[in-house]
A protein has these predicted regions:
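Glycine/serine-rich anion-binding loops at beta->alpha junctions
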Residues: 53-89
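Short coil/turn segments at secondary-structure boundaries
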Residues: 47-53
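Extended polybasic, low-complexity segments that bind anionic RNA or targeting/receptor surfaces
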Residues: 1-41, 45, 90-208
Length: 208
């Protein structure tokens, strides 16, 4: 399987062969689901905290005598029955982290790439962005006939892509990603995936 390599004007420069073991596998929906769940869970802060009746300040004194008032008996104003009292079984700080074997994580990425294979656009590089200006990136999007959510995978540290981050920063529908940060969530959310030729090679080497 192969893809055309385009310049940023949408003109064909050549072809690149995509590794079928990375871009042509049968998408495994279950493994992709597990990877997505892991990614979302691992992003959770897990710092929610509510105080129990033992942790709320005050409430040490019995509010009224046990008998003779006509009221229900009470031992503390910090009981969960009172406003301002402690919370029963409230949240406590905890880790939501989920582990996943490396082999399964790789399969999830391969599945996501294969599921998006038809929406992948390969460009040589972004050296045409000579200045960090939004209009240059907007022009490239128009030339490549892209729409919706666009995921751009490129090494923004490379000399030929040095202006890419600033040029794309003000376009809400464009998300930049380093090849090393490739993840299932961003791949599945994107309508188009734009990769540089170098990024394709880096991803292939990492996943095969």
């Amino acid at each position: 399987m192969s893809k055309e390599i385009l310049n940023t004007n949408g003109e064909k420069l050549g072809e690149i062969k995509l590794n079928a073991e990375v871009f042509g596998v049968e998408p495994n929906l279950h493994v992709m689901h597990l990877a997505l769940r892991r990614q979302l869970n691992n992003a959770r802060q897990g710092s929610a905290c509510a105080k129990t009746r033992a942790e709320v300040s005050g409430g040490g004194k019995k509010p009224w005598k046990q008998k003779g008032t006509g009221r229900a008996r009470a031992g503390s104003l910090r009981s969960p029955l009172f406003v301002g009292g402690g919370v029963v079984f409230g949240p406590k700080p905890r880790s939501f982290e989920i582990n996943m074997p490396q082999k399964a994580r790789k399969l999830a990425l391969k599945s996501a790439l294969s599921a998006r294979e038809e929406q992948i656009v390969v460009v040589k590089d972004f050296s045409a962005i000579t200045e960090p200006k939004t209009k240059l990136m907007a022009g490239i999007i128009k030339s490549l006939e892209l729409s919706g959510k666009i995921l751009v995978i490129a090494d923004t540290m490379a000399e030929e892509n040095k202006n890419l981050s600033l040029a794309a920063g003000n376009i809400p529908s464009v998300k930049l990603l380093l090849p090393s940060n490739l993840n299932v969530k961003d791949l599945l959310e994107a309508d188009f995936v734009v990769m540089t030729e170098k990024a394709v090679n880096v991803i292939t080497e990492r996943l095969q």
